[in-house]
Amino acid sequence: MTKKLHIKTWGCQMNEYDSSKMADLLDATHGYQLTEVAEEADVLLLNTCSIREKAQEKVFHQLGRWKLLKEKNPDLIIGVGGCVASQEGDHIRQRAHYVDIIFGPQTLHRLPEMINSVRGNRSPVVDISFPEIEKFDRLPEPRAEGPTAFVSIMEGCNKYCTYCVVPYTRGEEVSRPCDDILFEIAQLAAQGVREVNLLGQNVNAWRGENYDGTTGSFADLLRLVAAIDGIDRIRFTTSHPIEFTDDIIDVYRDTPELVSFLHLPVQSGSDRVLNLMGRTHTALEYKAIIRKLREARPDIQISSDFIVGFPGETTEDFEKTMKLIADVNFDMSYSFIFSARPGTPAADMVDDVPEADKKQRLYILQERINQQAMAWSRRMLGTVQRILVEGTSRKNIMELSGRTENNRVVNFEGTPDLVGKFVDVEIVDVYTNSLRGKIVRTEAEMGLRIAESPESVIARTRKENDLGVGIYQP
């Protein structure tokens, strides 16, 4: 009988990536098949996020529902991972004694051993340590699930913004070696992936070891990824302004595979608030980065993160944020009302902004961003956009859907054989959350790189070290 695994994931794209790796790992080691139905599963894993308000209580509410399943099936294994697990540790076991496994983001690769231990002696396992980058050495080969893929290139963050728990839950910055990243991407390209999104909590701070022992920069890595045949689009998230150096901007000048869209969080337009947040940059420095980016890539569109109602934020501070939003002309944003995360310096600050003011500021900010986003969309009307076809449309299964370089969803008529390929589409209509288009050119007419297949890239570049471990050498 097939053993089944159910994973519930909350939070960022890094968590989504981690969950996919858990599924691949437990399939390879134990033969567990993913199921969307928790009641069918032999193992339940909750991959948690501590960014949002009341994250801990949300975890215990979910575990309470799973407790009922365990009462019916005592052999059911329940595991909690992610940032809340890293933060709370044994406290989860104290409140939810039926939880068998507690693991952090850096120890998910040990899940097979943890499950074996629980199966063997029924004693719970807690492992929320930070074993550097070890987890990437223990994961199976990547499996593509469509033409786009996420690839984690580093873990952790050294910035210690006063509101953020990431350095405490994922540890400080650790970069994967360059060869490991390139080989994983080449493997994905061999499976039909055309677009990769490089992931990290502070992705542009990547400083990985090259095959010759030297240290590479993020700009170096971007150019190496762009050189892999079959990879025609590169995205990355999330960046920090303080690490957005001129050499990265130069990549936008000479590397067309790097998309004309950037998510660069700023959080506030007030230097006083930025200082309270520990952001180590000013609003003017942020705008200088955007100015240089638009000189290098005039059509680039920018999204950002904003926190409103941070302790001490005045009406004048908020007005400076709104001015920055207008000056930069952001295309979209992830914006939130401040809520204190336990254990962070901001949690000890006096939360002196009235709740009504926070909600009003968030509404004003989001309305302005939405207006700017719609204006950007309307400018695209009548233009021809290159779309990576990702699958059928959510709105109409008889149509196809894909994304533009600037991350707009476009729905259009087309045949199933176009999935996983690029098409040029004329934008004929604009909606709030999507665009509509019609095909004017298919990939066969584009002259994309076809000299070498991704398979030949792997065959040419795979080497083995003295231990028999495969490495990628450009």
Curated annotation (Swiss-Prot):
Its cofactor is [4Fe-4S] cluster. It is found in: Cytoplasm. PROSITE patterns: MTTASE_N, MTTASE_RADICAL, RADICAL_SAM, TRAM. Its EC number is 2.8.4.3. SMART domains: Elp3 (SM00729). The keyword 4Fe-4S applies. InterPro entries: Elp3/MiaA/NifB-like_rSAM, Methylthiotransferase, Methylthiotransferase_CS, Methylthiotransferase_N, Methylthiotransferase_N_sf, MiaB_methiolase, rSAM, rSAM_horseshoe. Residues 3-120 form the MTTase N-terminal domain. The keyword Kinase does not apply. Coiled coil: none annotated. One of its GO terms (cellular component) is cytosol. Monomer. Catalyzes the methylthiolation of N6-(dimethylallyl)adenosine (i(6)A), leading to the formation of 2-methylthio-N6-(dimethylallyl)adenosine (ms(2)i(6)A) at position 37 in tRNAs that read codons beginning with uridine. This is tRNA-2-methylthio-N(6)-dimethylallyladenosine synthase. It comes from Klebsiella pneumoniae subsp. pneumoniae (strain ATCC 700721 / MGH 78578). The gene is miaB.
